[in-house]
């Protein structure tokens, strides 16, 4: 009888432990979902900052083209991971390669100043390039380099889901818009990339350094970018009942 009593108590003990474990699992799951809701993250989904981090770690040691042999740092992108406006250039320069951040050289300083002059801030946008590694001598990107690197940029766009993309210069504009027309012909014209994302091509800020006469057009195009973004936001607000 004693053995049976002990066995019965042991079975009761195991049942209690099992129930307690089930309770803990439910509690942890509930608290995790509540945490997601507080952060504005849908259940079962990861936020854009986490997804961008995952993408960075998946490509930080990329060796798909020869540029990796010359780089000091991979220049992934920087800015607000939930930005409504995304700026895209062509490739990192010397300062970008040294610091691992996009648009931190002379062209970057001009861009930051110009954004401020039209009421925009770098803190609110996301900036990336077609290439993540610096081409030697700041030469133009080669077709094979663009081919292997462009999917990374596409994934960044997919994660960030910007309302508006501003392509800076020939390479970014021609690539995203699938056109052979030069930037002087297509700049300042609203076009479409995918779904609800519009694109406005503008001069690359580096071009304005070498051709100061273009800076006025550069600023006017950024004003257009600002106004289009406001228009998109106002349109969305008017749909809310």
Which residues does each predicted region cover?
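A polyanion-binding, active-site-adjacent surface
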Residues: 18-28, 33-241
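Non-catalytic accessory regions outside enzyme or core folds
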Residues: 1-29
């Amino acid at each position: 009888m004693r053995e049976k009593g002990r066995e019965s108590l042991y079975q009761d003990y195991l049942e209690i432990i099992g129930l307690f474990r089930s309770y803990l699992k439910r509690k942890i799951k509930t608290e995790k979902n509540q945490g997601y809701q507080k952060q504005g993250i849908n259940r079962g989904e990861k936020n854009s900052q986490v997804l961008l981090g995952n993408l960075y770690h998946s490509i930080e040691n990329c060796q798909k083209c020869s540029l990796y042999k010359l780089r000091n740092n991979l220049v992934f992108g920087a800015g607000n991971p939930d930005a409504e406006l995304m700026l895209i250039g062509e490739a990192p320069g010397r300062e970008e390669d040294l610091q691992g951040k996009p648009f931190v050289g002379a062209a970057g300083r001009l861009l930051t100043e110009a954004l401020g002059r039209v009421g925009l801030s770098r803190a609110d946008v996301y900036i990336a390039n077609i290439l993540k590694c610096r081409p030697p001598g700041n030469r133009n990107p080669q077709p094979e380099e663009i081919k292997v690197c462009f999917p990374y940029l596409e994934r960044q766009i997919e994660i960030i889901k910007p309302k508006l993309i501003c392509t800076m210069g020939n390479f970014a504009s021609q690539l995203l818009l699938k056109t052979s027309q030069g930037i002087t012909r297509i700049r300042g014209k609203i076009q479409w990339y995918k779904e609800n994302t519009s694109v406005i091509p503008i001069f690359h800020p580096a071009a304005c350094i070498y051709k100061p006469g273009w800076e006025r057009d550069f600023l006017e195009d950024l004003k257009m970018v600002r106004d289009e973004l406001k228009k998109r936001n106002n349109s969305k607000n008017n749909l809310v009942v």
